[in-house]
Amino acid sequence: MGKNLRDLLLAFKNGDISLDEIEKQIKLNYYEEIEERLKLDINRQFRTGVPEVVYGKGKDIDEIIKATLKLVEKNGIALATKIEDIEKLSDEIRKWNLKNYDIKINKKAKTLIIKNKNYEVKKIGKVGILTAGTSDIPVAEEAKDTLEIMGVEAITAYDVGIAGIHRLFPALKRMIEEDVCCIIVVAGMEGALPSVIASMVDIPVIGVPTSTSYGIKITPLLTMLHSCSPGIAVVNIDNGFGAGVFAGLIAKIMHK
């Protein structure tokens, strides 16, 4: 596994590399280029606390695997999201020699996680994830995988929307018992569930509108933005990744 910026600084501190060598390596570490088409920001995690992630939409399978492996080489673990042909990726990745890696393909979320077997993700807290319906689960799973690479445990409860609100209370009780630092709430249709949750808890709620609804797909987004319950942040439609990042950063701050 290659060295990231933190590893280089520790090596310099311990006297393992010279000043000239660390200067050279830092310059080389600004980004990694793959066949002039992909430029990976490999030190994003050091700057922002959030690792570079491969956005799979519009990329072919070979590009996705190469880019993800390059990030793993530098950071130990990497995620690819919005993979359009997840079945093809599942078939193609078997042809690669990846015996030194743990591979997780989430067909529902259309994500790929590759981790070096020698890399251990530092655990930094817990986040709750709720969905209104089963149709919202793919977006919730994308958020869950994002949290996983950030070292955050996801406590999940799916299909607990307001059409059968009695289903919600045991799930919410468990979230409180698990001491989650915030709750991601994924909902389509009219998008009311985040407002209900925010009226019951004293922690941040992150609303994720989904496109799984009748009529105009923007409806749940507008509902969440116009909520009368304070304490809700809202990401864009189907943006499980963005919700996972936001929640992961909250967990990171709480862990300090």
UniProtKB/Swiss-Prot annotation:
Reply yes or no: does the keyword Transmembrane helix apply: yes
Please indicate if the UniProt record lists Transmembrane as a keyword.
yes
SMART domains linked to this entry: AIRC
What GO CC annotations are associated with the protein?
plasma membrane
Give the bilayer topology. Multi-pass membrane protein
Annotated GO biological process: 'de novo' IMP biosynthetic process
Subcellular localization(s) per the UniProt record? Cell membrane
* Single annotated GO MF: hydrolase activity
Q: Which UniProt keywords apply?
A: Cell membrane, Membrane, Transmembrane, Transmembrane helix
Q: Which ranges does the record mark as transmembrane?
A: 181-201, 231-251
Q: Name one Pfam family in it.
A: AIRC
Q: What is this protein identified as?
A: Uncharacterized protein MJ0165
